[in-house]
Design a protein with these regions (language model features):
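Non-catalytic, well-ordered alpha-helical scaffold segments
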Residues: 14, 65, 151, 155, ...
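AAA+ P-loop ATPase catalytic core
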Residues: 136, 153-164, 177-199, 211-214, ...
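Conserved C-terminal "switch" segment of AAA+ ATPases
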Residues: 101-105, 111-174, 196-201, 226-231, ...
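Charge-rich, low-complexity amphipathic helices
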Residues: 38, 89-93, 128, 132, ...
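Canonical AAA+ ATPase core
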Residues: 1-42, 47-144, 187-199
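C-terminal engagement/docking regions of AAA+ P-loop ATPases
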Residues: 193-384
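Structural motif
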Residues: 173-179, 330
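Residue-level signal for threonine
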Residues: 41, 150, 207
Length: 384
């Protein structure tokens, strides 16, 4: 009941509709004038069913013309035969909404014969995008048993695509592939699985640091404008990941920018004073780093070692328990790491990659250092 054909440049009328089969005529000793020598194509064989042609613009114009009669009169014509075969077929055609290549186009009379044109669009909400990724991602049962991906990780990955669609370095019309989040989610799970195998762990979860593994998925799924090419695909992808962390951080914890602002309060008609702000919930964390402490998180770090390292930071566990009192040990550890990346995204602490590890330090001390504050592409490539 279902037939499908990918429109490649080598598709012919014979493939779709049919042609005379000389071998069949010779074997059956039939004249070419006999209708029995006809070899029917995929469309007649899909009668009383659904037939789909994918990537319609790739179909040559002369082949598209051969579909006119089928769509309008509902019959087929093969060679010189006076053959009228009524067909009962539901035709479906697919094409990219933004065809920015020079491969061809849909001829106007054929487009006129297509009864309805449904225009697709990117998912309007994170929830819709999450459902699509969950449905399409190819995560094996063994991976699901070994690796747990929290809702936070899934939303961060989806947010990357939303950030890309509004990014100045990414082409606005067709710069973001619909497969970006699917490939990124699979890459994140694979990164966590690889780490678990290295340390012989029975199960693990996807950490924020594992999202460094989705950078190749992002660079291969976005089309950059000229300025983006100058910036570099890797830097743009890393910037998108950091922006998604920054955007999503305020959905889980207080906005650090709001805490920096001091509200003026009128004291009298002639005097104004600044209202004293309550101490920031991140004060203990930033003070710990200001005291000269630093935290190193290896990309291939064991879960147990990472949790121990996170608990060294003063106030980190406290802020997670304050806003997420119901979080279990695994969730709390992930949120603790998320807080560090979030504070780095809001420039309260610094974050940089050195030899396969993420180093968190105080911002002032890092500014005195001439090193970069971001992941280095060469460092990451060592861990592929």
């Amino acid at each position: 009941r279902y037939g499908e054909k990918l429109a490649t440049p080598d598709v012919s009328v014979s493939d779709l509709i049919g042609d005379i089969d000389p071998i069949k005529a010779a074997n059956l000793k039939l004249s070419f004038a006999d209708e029995k020598v006809i070899h029917y194509g995929i469309i007649p064989r899909s009668n009383r069913g659904i037939f789909v042609i994918n990537e319609l613009p790739d179909l040559q114009a002369r082949i598209q013309v051969s579909l006119f009669n089928i769509l309008q009169e509902g019959d087929i014509q093969i060679r010189g035969f006076k053959l009228r075969m009524p067909l009962d077929i539901l035709f479906v055609f697919t094409a990219n909404p933004e065809d920015y290549t020079n491969r061809g186009s849909i001829v106007t009379p054929l487009k006129d014969r297509i009864e309805s044109q449904i225009l697709t669009h990117y998912p309007k909400s994170i929830e819709t995008s999450l459902a699509i990724t969950e449905q399409e991602a190819n995560i094996l049962p063994a991976q699901k048993d070994k690796v747990e991906a929290s809702d936070l990780i899934k939303r961060l990955i989806e947010q990357v695509s939303f950030e890309a669609r509004t990014n100045e370095f990414v082409d606005k019309k067709s710069g973001v592939s619909a497969r970006l989040t699917i490939a990124a989610y699979e890459a994140a799970v694979s990164s966590a699985e690889r780490r678990a195998i290295i340390h012989n762990e029975k199960n693990t979860q996807v950490w924020i640091s594992d999202l460094s593994g989705i950078i190749p998925a992002i660079t291969g799924k976005i089309e950059l404008v000229y300025e983006g090419e100058q910036e570099g695909p890797y830097e743009v992808a890393l910037n998108l990941l950091n922006k998604s962390i920054r955007t999503l951080f305020v959905s889980y914890f207080p906005n650090p920018d709001d805490l920096k602002k001091k509200k003026p309060v009128k004291k009298s008609t002639t005097q104004t004073t600044e209202q004293k702000q309550p101490e920031s919930p991140y004060a203990l964390i930033t003070k710990w780093f200001d005291a000269g402490n630093h935290l190193d998180l290896l990309l291939d770090m064991k879960d147990e070692d990472k949790v121990i390292a996170l608990y060294k930071v003063d106030g980190l566990f406290g802020i997670v328990k304050k806003y997420f009192p119901q979080a279990d040990e695994k969730q709390a550890a992930l949120l603790m790491e998320f807080v560090l990346h979030g504070l780095a995204a809001y420039s309260l602490i610094s974050k940089k990659m050195i030899d396969g590890k993420i180093e968190f330090k105080d911002l002032m001390g890092s500014m005195m250092n001439l090193g970069t504050m971001n992941f280095e592409e060469d460092d990451y490539s060592d861990y592929q």
